[in-house]
Every structure is written in C-alpha cells, then in structure tokens.
Amino acid sequence: MAKAKFERTKPHVNIGTIGHIDHGKTTLTAAITKVLHDAYPDLNEATPFDNIDKAPEERQRGITISIAHVEYQTEARHYAHVDCPGHADYIKNMITGAAQMDGAILVVAATDGPMPQTKEHVLLARQVGVPYIVVALNKADMVDDEEIMELVELEVRELLSEYEFPGDDLPVVRVSALKALEGDAQWTQSVLDLMKAVDESIPEPERDVDKPFLMPIEDVFTITGRGTVVTGRIERGVLKVNETVDIIGIKTEKTTTTVTGIEMFRKLLDEGQAGENVGLLLRGIKREDVERGQVIIKPGSVTPHTEFEAQAYILSKDEGGRHTPFFNNYRPQFYFRTTDVTGVVHLPEGTEMVMPGDNTEMRVELIQPVAMEEGLKFAIREGGRTVGAGQVTKIVK
C-alpha cells in the first residue's frame, strides 16, 4: 500500500452508521477504524469496540444523547463518524441534528434482513434530509446461500426506494465486521470496498461559505453619528461591504437595505463569512425597524413562513421535559435561531396525544412569520424551558 500523508486540504465528510439494533453498527464502526489503521497506519488510529459502545453522553438543547465520535481517513478523504449505542439515541440525534450527517452507512444483517428499526431509521433519514445512503450487508460470512443474500439485498433496495432513496442504484456491499476485526483477509478487503463505495457515492457537502448569505440577528444597537448596527454570527455565505440585503421574519413586511460597514473585534472588514461573529452597519435603518429573531439574507434567498410540517422529539421527564402528555392544539413557543415564536400544534390523524419521550410528526401554525427552509431546526419551549426539539420537514405556507 502506498502511504497517504495527512493533509488538512482533504475534503471533510460527516457520516454515521444507522440500522436495527444488533445488526452490527458499532462492530462495523470499530472494524472500519481497525482496517483503515492497518492499511494507512500514519493516518488512522484503531478505536476498539468498547470505546465506541460506552459512548459519552452529550447534551444538545437539554436533550441527553449518547454519541460516539470517531475519525478516520481514506486516501481521498477525512471522515468524522458518529455511532449511537441505543435506538432512542439515534432518533434524538437524527431529529435534533446533534451530529449532522452528509451521508449514512445503513447496516443490515444479512441473517435478518430489514427489521422495524431499519425502516424507522430510513424514514427518519428521509425526513431529516440525510442525503445519501450506502448499505453494508453485515454478517455476510454467516449466509452461505447466494439466493438468500440476493433476496435480502433486494428487500433492502426496495425499502430504500419506498422512502425515495435511489434503491436500485446505490451501493450495497457485503461485509463481515466481526471477521474484519479478527483480521480475516477476505473480510478486511470487504471493509475497504465499503469505504471505497462511501468515498465514491457520498458527495462532498457544499461548504457553508458557498451557500447564500444568512445571519440571524442577535442584538441591535445605535451608534451615534453612524446609524444602526446589528450583531450576530454569520450562519452561511459571504457578505461584502456595500452589498444589498433583505431583513425578514417576525414582521409582516421585509426591509431592504445596504450594508455600509462590517466589523469584527472593533476592526473594519471588507467582508464577513460563515462562522464569524460580526456587527453590520445598515444604511437608513432605525433601531426600531429591526429586532432579534429576524435574519439578514442575500435578497430573495429565503422566505418567511407561518405554517410548516415537522418531525419532533419530545423530552422525557428524566430529561427535564414535561411530566404529562400534550394534545391537539397545544400552544408552546418554537425557538428558531435566536427567538421564540408561539405556535399551535396539530397532531397527525389518529394521534390522540404525545407522551414525553416520544417522537412525532406535527403541523405547526406560528403567530408570526419566521425565515425558514426545509431542514431548519428548532426547540420547543414552555416559558423558557426546553420540552422538545425538531426540524422542519415541509413548508405549508
């Protein structure tokens, strides 16, 4: 094997393992790190199974999630990989986006085929916008009958097609994570084949700086003799001095203005970009024209909406959530980016109520418009206390 040297210039991609309990997600994660460590020792450390299985707990918006993070490199790319030990952790992670995925490895045991959680994870992947899936047909060493293997593969492809993934075309790689961990040459190669499929069929994500400019407003100030300054962290894109922007959300009408100055740490800049905390000086805007919770955008790139469908996870009592269920027409606050907006919840037909610890679909009507797109995340709050988290799956109006 030629040695690949560590280059920070390598594309970085976030992936994760999803699939039914005991189909081998964590074993496969460990096997990938071992196989890549053996193939490219300078690039990778092997992470043992126990370190991944005893994942530390993280808190995201008050929700406790056990997530294991490992990293590894192929010759082409640098990967950050998430694996969750429990089924509930997966659901919370996927809905809250605690660890965003550019693509996923769906692990299906060849001995079982698709199971209920396989379906649930694929449905969630579709709903929360995991864009690409590669299938690892695990425990392939335990199935001798080629016909059975082909049937299982067909079943997985049909399931993926049913949820609008390209089931007929996406890669399905037969692996044995356990045998690869034990150092078996044939199955070690299968894991390398899997990573080649991941390299080739999960595209590099668009970088935040390449997306249209958006900055949520956190604060508004007046600077005597200069005008109104809004501050916030640029969520995406690049903004240059003297560019025109729209300010939308919260109020019914949008405001269009020109950015006459960009400051960071009291220094004037020519441009600000994704990830930076900046102050923007706005031409001809009075302090009362803008408020926290609005967003500043590249004109026309995002629109404000009041009604949307969402997938949400409701905190359990142990997580500090509600102690009782809620019903149709529940009216909490929805915290988008930097502010709370009250909304009315409509539950799906046939859902009487939602218990703490459940995940559910819902349709929400907000009392004020919010700049939103599919995939936007929010917290559900009652008087400042987080009781749930979710993301927009479809805009209604």
Curated annotation (Swiss-Prot):
Residues 10-206 form the tr-type G domain. Residues 83-86 are annotated as: G3. Keywords: Cytoplasm, Elongation factor, GTP-binding, Hydrolase, Magnesium, Metal-binding, Nucleotide-binding, Protein biosynthesis. Residues 62-66 are annotated as: G2. It is found in: Cytoplasm. Mg(2+) binds at T26. GO terms for molecular function: GTP binding; GTPase activity; translation elongation factor activity. Residues 19-26 are annotated as: G1. Its main location: cytoplasm. CDD domains: EF_Tu (cd01884), EFTU_II (cd03697), EFTU_III (cd03707). The keyword Phosphoprotein does not apply. InterPro entries: EF-Tu_GTP-bd, EF-Tu_GTPase, EFTu-like_2, EFTU_2, G_TR_CS, P-loop_NTPase, Small_GTP-bd, T_Tr_GTP-bd_dom. One of its GO terms (cellular component) is cytosol. Belongs to the TRAFAC class translation factor GTPase superfamily. Classic translation factor GTPase family. EF-Tu/EF-1A subfamily. Monomer. This is Elongation factor Tu-1. The gene is tuf1.
